[in-house]
């Protein structure tokens, strides 16, 4: 498992460390997930959660106030409160504050909306923070926002890429940012790779970013960001 920071570029600090699944030879999450059968999704999802908490706590994340961001599979959760027990046990063992755990899910995964809302509301009641990942690349982003407002929305890297030179992308990102501001949801732009993209996003008012410009994922370590 690797960690990549999410940066507050205004305060120049790490807001969160995102736990990223990696294979034994460094394969990315997409490859690893493609090897998981439907029957194994629940066990895999549970293992990823507890491993992320154990590793992050061992690296000192629990004590520095930053969030731990964990990606979860909504279709692997059959009943929210039953499926969260191992996560709560792991957090308890590690003395990891529940309010410092952020659960991300991607809108590209087809999932029953009522089921997803049940998960998100249960997690919020426990004290976890929530985020929609890859916003703008999936099926139901705006419709979901009408029913549930997460703490964060991560704008998809395909919209961020070349935002400084692509007028259409810039207009779309600006529009999404206005909607999120109206809903009091914090925006995170992911996949920021160039100084020009960074400057364009700053001009649009973005303060939370993630990408290779700041730090690449670090295997079993907390990557230290560099600043443009």
Question: What is each model feature region?
Answer:
Residues 8-13, 106-110, 139-228:
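EAL-family c-di-GMP phosphodiesterase catalytic domain
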């Amino acid at each position: 498992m690797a960690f990549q920071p999410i940066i507050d570029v205004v305060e120049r600090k790490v807001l969160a460390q995102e736990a990223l699944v990696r294979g034994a030879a460094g394969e990315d999450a997409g490859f690893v997930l493609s090897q998981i059968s439907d029957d194994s999704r629940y066990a895999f999802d549970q293992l990823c959660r507890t491993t992320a908490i154990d590793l992050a706590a061992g690296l000192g994340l629990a004590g520095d106030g930053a969030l731990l961001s964990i990606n979860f599979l909504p279709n692997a959760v059959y009943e929210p409160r039953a499926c969260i027990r191992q996560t709560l046990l792991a957090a308890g063992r590690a003395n990891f504050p529940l309010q410092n755990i952020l659960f991300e899910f991607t809108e590209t995964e087809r999932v029953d909306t009522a089921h997803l809302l049940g998960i998100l509301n249960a997690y919020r009641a426990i004290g976890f923070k929530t985020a929609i990942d890859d916003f703008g690349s999936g099926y139901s982003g705006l419709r979901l926002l009408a029913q549930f407002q997460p703490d964060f929305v991560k704008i998809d890297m395909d919209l961020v890429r070349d935002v400084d030179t692509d007028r259409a992308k810039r207009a779309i990102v600006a529009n999404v940012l206005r909607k999120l501001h109206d809903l009091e949801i914090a925006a995170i732009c992911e996949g920021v790779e160039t100084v020009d993209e960074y400057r364009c996003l700053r001009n649009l008012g973005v303060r939370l970013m993630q990408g290779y410009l700041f730090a690449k994922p670090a295997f079993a370590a907390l990557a230290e960001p560099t600043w443009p």
